[in-house]
Curated annotation (Swiss-Prot):
Pfam families: Cytochrom_B_C, Cytochrome_B. This is Cytochrome b. It comes from Microtus yuldaschi (Juniper mountain vole). Belongs to the cytochrome b family. It is a multi-pass membrane protein. A ubiquinone binds at H201. CDD domains: cytochrome_b_C, Cytochrome_b_N. GO terms for molecular function: metal ion binding; ubiquinol-cytochrome-c reductase activity. SUPFAM superfamilies: a domain/subunit of cytochrome bc1 complex (Ubiquinol-cytochrome c reductase), Transmembrane di-heme cytochromes. Binds 2 heme b groups non-covalently. The keyword Transmembrane helix applies. The keyword Mitochondrion applies.
Amino acid sequence: MTNIRKKHPLIKIINHSFIDLPAPSNISSWWNFGSLLGLCLIIQILTGLFLAMHYTSDTATAFSSVAHICRDVNYGWLIRYMHANGASMFFICLFLHVGRGVYYGSYNMIETWNMGIILLFAVMATAFMGYVLPWGQMSFWGATVITNLLSAIPYIGTTLVEWIWGGFSVDKATLTRFFAFHFILPFIITALVLVHLLFLHETGSNNPTGLNSDADKIPFHPYYTIKDFLGVLILLMVSMILTLFFPDVLGDPDNYTPANPLNTPPHIKPEWYFLFAYAILRSIPNKLGGVLALILSILILALMPLLHTSKQRALTFRPITQTMYWILVADLFILTWIGGQPVEYPFIIIGQAASIAYFTIIVILMPIAGMIENNIMDLD
């Protein structure tokens, strides 16, 4: 068996990635989220596949086909809610995974980090298109508002929007192509995940100290397989509690009303995991400026390696930057809250202040804090 594991051309790759992989001996539970994201992706692909067997991507029947899945298909309600809440669990794991990377300076593994940013954009695009498919009120108006943002691009904007819509408004053609893209993207994401892992295994994992761990490695199996399994059990437990007891708690009641182009909902908002970016978009009165801020809110992660001024990699022994980091986390919670509020006083001004704080902390305050810490600790 050992011989096959180490010599078979295909099993050898799995062995080097998940069994005999040398891993730092001190990585904490914050390193569990990579495997949990892999599990989320598998769950989403499987539940999505079964949903696609019963779903119809036509404006006349899309809404009723989702109702049919919940009412008439065996365990259809379970598959549908596992898929919907699975997306929320996916994003919770994603945000924690990225947060861990920022805290422990994992962005210094530039190829892995940039691949992760591409993955984040791909997952966000997939989730957005998936939200359009049930063809409820929020699906339709969310699609209209977000795709319409592309019209802010000078010269080609309007043509681009109509090209994406496949007509002069969000309609049958839009729904069909969104379903096609929503189906294919997870498989592209799976391929990108393999590239992400390939880059990671070139350098090896980071660890909570931020120090080189080559002198102290342990095999991934059994130590981290059993540790990851605990994370898997917790994730599945939380997912099932959410799916079976509170299936609609993270959704929008408006999406239980069929799409109606003649009736605008009083408050258009995306799913909770996009609210922070939506708040940044809305905080700028100019359309193009808002779109740029929206893209930059995620793309700013790519600047992290350039903005790293400290001689230490992780924030473990850097109290000033740690404080900045947790203020940033609090700021993201504020932005998420504001994104779900109506556009009126005092929410407008709070959103603008939180948006300015978000970019200021990342671009100015954290790099300055790093330099101050270098001086305090005589690391120059």
